[in-house]
A protein has these predicted regions:
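Core alpha-helical transmembrane segments of integral membrane proteins
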Residues: 282-352
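Membrane-helix interface "capping/anchor" motifs
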Residues: 291, 352-362, 378-380
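Small-residue-enriched core segments of transmembrane alpha-helices in multipass membrane transport
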Residues: 293-300, 364-376
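Conserved small/polar residues in nucleotide/adenosyl-binding loops
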Residues: 384
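Short alpha-helical transmembrane interface motifs in multi-pass membrane proteins
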Residues: 331, 355-358, 373
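Membrane-embedded alpha-helical signal segments
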Residues: 1-301, 315, 319
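Membrane-helix boundary elements
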Residues: 339, 349, 372-373, 378
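Short glycine-/small-residue-rich flexible loop motifs, especially phosphate/cofactor-binding loops
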Residues: 160, 243, 347, 374-375
Length: 385
């Protein structure tokens, strides 16, 4: 397969067929069918697995087989099908080779006619994909239980189903990648600031990367300060959460092939929120969120405060606890600082092994790691006592 240029389509059907054979002739899933309608030679091209032969037969070939009144040449046939027929064609005819390749790769069936420099793309997409399931990384007790999938238009339809207003807008764009991956910018025109939307479009259009596999690829290009440790965007796999963010005036970015939606702009406090906070009472939800903040502060500053207190300010520790800590440190071959780093490193190794290993052994790895760490802690406790 070679690279398609932006040259216009030829008038001769044989020339366009030769171009398609040059591009996709070596692919076993590429399918073409030549036929004649009202004396006009035509050709249908599609990819098996991306387009449905059943849809093509029912909607296109059956209608074309009935004959096209008054059409004796290719340009008249294309014009009639594009403007007067009820077939599901794209709004704009294909005029260049690049558009032809992108339409075929997008799962459409393309009709080429002799003597016409335009082609028609029919919406016969039938791409296999994962069905809607429960979100794996955002569990909740109440509320919707559906999650995004890898199909871009299905994800947009999930948002459209919950956001039933005319101000909801989903703009599908093509990334500047070799694979020409599609992404969607979803927002509410009545709530999202127009200047923010325009700035975001310009930044995303200027992204130059070889491949776009996930919405997280855009994160580094949206950050103004590269040294800022706080995330520039939030992520969710729940359509309900994405819809709630759109109602707040934020912008949601969906990428074809990714079940993860990016929400911009994002605040650090929003990473502690979940759907259950809004389905519970205000007092209970506030206490749970406060607990999350305390847990975060403890996880971030707890090890450092412990090392600081043991190494540099032992007078801050109660005497009876300090004596037990001293006994434990006497039997430990490492000082407090390297000891804490070693424990943190071991925890990260166990977590990474449990996350990346195959599912058949990941639970075993996590269980063995927990048993080893627990046994070490119990043994250390016994030695102190």
């Amino acid at each position: 397969m070679t690279t398609a240029d932006n040259q216009p389509l030829g008038q001769a059907l044989a020339e366009n067929q030769a171009f398609l054979q040059t591009m996709f002739g070596g692919s076993s899933d590429f399918y073409t069918k030549s036929f004649t309608i009202c004396g006009c030679r035509c050709c249908i091209a599609m990819f098996a697995g991306l387009s449905s032969p059943e849809k093509l037969c029912i909607m296109v070939l059956h209608a074309l087989g009935q004959g096209v009144p008054g059409c004796k040449a290719g340009p008249q046939l294309v014009q009639y099908l594009a403007e007067q027929s009820c077939l599901p064609t794209e709004q704009t005819p294909i005029t260049t080779r690049t558009q032809l390749v992108e339409a075929l790769a997008g799962g459409m069936a393309v009709l080429l006619a002799e003597g016409s420099g335009q082609a028609l793309a029919f919406s016969t997409q039938d791409m296999p994909g994962r069905s809607v399931t429960n979100p794996s990384g955002e569990g909740n007790m109440r509320g919707p239980q559906d999650a995004f999938t890898e199909h871009l238009r299905n994800n947009i339809s999930q948002l459209r189903r919950q956001f039933r207003t005319g101000s909801f807008t989903a703009e599908i764009c093509t990334a500047n990648t070799r694979a020409k991956t599609e992404y969607a910018i979803c927002y509410d025109t009545a709530l999202a600031p127009a200047d923010v939307v325009q700035t975001l479009k310009q930044r995303l259009a200027g992204v130059q990367i070889p491949v776009l596999l996930d919405s997280t690829y855009f994160a580094s290009f949206l950050k103004q300060d590269k040294l800022n440790l706080f995330p520039a965007a939030a992520y969710t796999e729940r359509p309900a959460t994405a819809c709630a963010r759109i109602c707040e005036g934020k912008i949601v970015i969906l990428v074809s092939g990714s079940p993860l939606a990016m929400v911009v702009p994002s605040f650090f406090a929003e990473h502690f929120e979940c759907l259950d906070d809004y389905s519970s009472g205000a007092v209970f939800a506030g206490l749970i969120r406060l607990l999350k903040y305390l847990a975060f502060l403890l996880a971030v500053f707890g090890p450092g405060l412990y090392v600081m207190a043991v190494s540099f300010a032992p007078e801050l520790i109660p005497v009876h606890l300090l004596a037990k800590l001293a006994q434990g440190e006497a039997s430990t071959p490492l000082p407090p600082m390297p000891e804490m780093l070693a424990v943190t490193l071991l925890l990260e190794i166990v977590r990474e092994a449990g996350l990346r290993a195959p599912k058949s052994i990941s639970h075993t790895v996590s269980l063995v790691g927990a048993l080893i760490i627990g046994e070490t802690a119990v043994s250390d406790r016994k030695s102190v006592v």
